[in-house]
């Protein structure tokens, strides 16, 4: 097993422990608590995969962090903060496309990871493009503002957007939501392609031809989820 993988897991466990202490002392907000719960599930899964005990990993992570802090200076911290990049905003859609009202003949919707997925299941045999507006940090999709599916004539047939009452979402949440949307639309023999920006910043794919943003196997899996859950 790679030593860096173990070290990363140990540090993640200890940092999660610190965040948990903040939560127990009512020193954090709702989005913080939401991320804490999700990360706990992720750590349990990683621990099971690696065959490592969470308690032992947390103690080892504490030693690693303490060693780093002993050699850390305030000046180094200032440099690290100053060099952190600011998010930038990517816009596939115009203001008109984002704000336009649309209606569904056969509405279907699903909530996943703090996001609402809505689609019109009456749409069949259409060529559809996905466009999105979102922020990017470290060359990866950070926060989705809105994603909409358009036919060649410009009609809106599906949409993904954050739910205001649900705190936060992650890149994986957005990718899962897009997978559900693509699976649902392709179930009715529609042809889907994602914008280059969606492919690049959500999946790290650079395809100027706008090819599929999900492998066929994953799209079939998502389609089955739509049929049974949406």
UniProtKB/Swiss-Prot annotation:
Pfam families: Flu_NS1. A motif (Nuclear export signal) lies at residues 137-146. GO terms for cellular component: host cell cytoplasm; host cell nucleus. GO terms for molecular function: protein serine/threonine kinase inhibitor activity; RNA binding. InterPro entries: NS1, NS1A, NS1A_effect_dom-like_sf, uS15_NS1_RNA-bd_sf. It is found in: Host nucleus; Host cytoplasm. Upon interferon induction, ISGylated via host HERC5; this results in the impairment of NS1 interaction with RNA targets due to its inability to form homodimers and to interact with host EIF2AK2/PKR. The keyword RNA-binding applies. Residues 223-230 are annotated as: PABPN1-binding. Residues 180-215 are annotated as: CPSF4-binding. One of its GO terms (biological process) is symbiont-mediated suppression of host type I interferon-mediated signaling pathway. The dsRNA-binding region is required for suppression of RNA silencing. Inhibits post-transcriptional processing of cellular pre-mRNA, by binding and inhibiting two cellular proteins that are required for the 3'-end processing of cellular pre-mRNAs: the 30 kDa cleavage and polyadenylation specificity factor/CPSF4 and the poly(A)-binding protein 2/PABPN1. In turn, unprocessed 3' end pre-mRNAs accumulate in the host nucleus and are no longer exported to the cytoplasm. Cellular protein synthesis is thereby shut off very early after virus infection. Belongs to the influenza A viruses NS1 family. This is Non-structural protein 1.
């Amino acid at each position: 097993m790679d030593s860096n993988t173990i070290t990363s897991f140990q540090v993640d466990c200890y940092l999660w422990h610190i965040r948990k202490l903040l939560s127990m002392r009512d020193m954090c907000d709702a989005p913080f608590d939401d991320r804490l719960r999700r990360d706990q599930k992720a750590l349990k899964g990683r621990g099971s995969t690696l065959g490592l005990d969470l308690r032992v990993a947390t103690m080892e992570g504490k030693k690693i962090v303490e060693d780093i802090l002993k050699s850390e200076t305030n000046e180094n911290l200032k440099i690290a903060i100053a060099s952190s990049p600011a998010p930038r905003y990517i816009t596939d859609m115009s203001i008109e496309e984002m704000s336009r009202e649309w209606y569904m003949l056969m509405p279907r919707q699903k909530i996943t990871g703090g996001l609402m997925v809505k689609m019109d299941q009456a749409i069949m045999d259409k060529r559809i493009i996905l466009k999105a507006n979102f922020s990017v940090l470290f060359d990866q999709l950070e926060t989705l503002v809105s994603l909409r599916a358009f036919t060649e004539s410009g009609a809106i047939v599906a949409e993904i957007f954050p739910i205001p009452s649900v705190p936060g979402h992650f890149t994986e949440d957005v990718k899962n939501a897009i997978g559900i949307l693509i699976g649902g639309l392709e179930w009715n023999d529609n042809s889907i392609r994602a914008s280059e920006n969606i492919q690049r910043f959500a999946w790290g794919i650079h395809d100027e031809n706008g090819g599929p943003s999900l492998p066929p196997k994953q799209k079939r899996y998502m389609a089955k989820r739509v049929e049974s859950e949406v």
